[in-house]
């Protein structure tokens, strides 16, 4: 026997029906006979399908409801149409006699012969629960959805603004861009219903922000203005800290502050460098010729050279300044090199240091540009003797107008015979404890 939805759900059960287990046992004992006492259209109406419909799902293609079991699966179309009409809304057929054939597969309820009634029987409402202590005001768990007012919802949600932003919004809303403390309270309470419940806490926070935040300035009240309490306004320099409309603090304030501090440090460094260069320039002009030339050196890291060097470099064709005696010392050392012998050791003069080039000490005043030296030096000073000794010939490769074979054919970075002046690096970047 095939039962459809009867045992599991009890969807189509009727009042006064015996238990499903008992009905199934009775139907198994006497497949063709109805029970002794039953209500019409009970579970006993579910009879065994015909032999041609061994598969319980084949009845869906047959004549269907309202046709007896004797009608096979391949019944006439008229019978199938009548069964469909009876199932979807026609009044049910009369009940079969007690000793007749078994009833149809599925019969609608007797009260109303419609398919919707069967669906209503399927979706029976649950039995009413006992009344809760809250009474009829709390119909269920989702009773909070009954709030229809937007203000009720706004009272529960905290606005996503800081107290500083609320103060700024209040001040910006004023026509004169200034408000008293009481007016700020009133603006916050009127604009956001959340703050209408407890005013003691947030009003205290408003006062703290006004006192501790540098963006809010206190403006005294005029003499002809009645009332009490000072006005509060926004500092014009702090308006960049708030976004348009939201008045939230920007994160760019830290970067702006760092850039401002960097510019301040750069300005202070420039001033100190200017003072250092001016002091060196005055020292060059005021030193007598007998002093050591090392005190007149320009620092290698200084951005501005001394005044004498600036004027000499700007006018390479002009006359040599008389206030720079270090150039004369440099030229005298060159002339000494040209006539010295290989065995003679040069003794360093005052202020000069060893440069590590063929054991020859030169004056530290060689830090001046080579173009200045070549343009101002006399030709007889720059020309070195080729008939000197071997040591002198080796040293002359550094100063000869044409490079030796050891120079590697490098191109001249200077427009002068001193383009292969390999001691320039040691002069620009001193190694041996030179004073800066």
Swiss-Prot record:
SUPFAM superfamilies: Winged helix' DNA-binding domain (SSF46785). One of its GO terms (cellular component) is nucleus. This is Forkhead box protein I3. Signal peptide: none annotated. It comes from Canis lupus familiaris. GO terms for molecular function: DNA-binding transcription factor activity, RNA polymerase II-specific; RNA polymerase II cis-regulatory region sequence-specific DNA binding. Pfam families: Forkhead (PF00250). Residues 257-277, 385-410 have a biased composition (Low complexity). It is found in: Nucleus. A motif (9aaTAD) lies at residues 422-430. Transcription factor required for pharyngeal arch development, and which is involved in hair, ear, jaw and dental development. May act as a pioneer transcription factor during pharyngeal arch development. Required for the development of the epithelium of hair and whisker placodes and that of teeth. Required for hair follicle stem cell specification. Acts downstream of TBX1 for the formation of the thymus and parathyroid glands from the third pharyngeal pouch. The lineage of its organism: Eukaryota, Metazoa, Chordata, Craniata, Vertebrata. The modification Phosphoserine is found at residues 132, 292, 302.
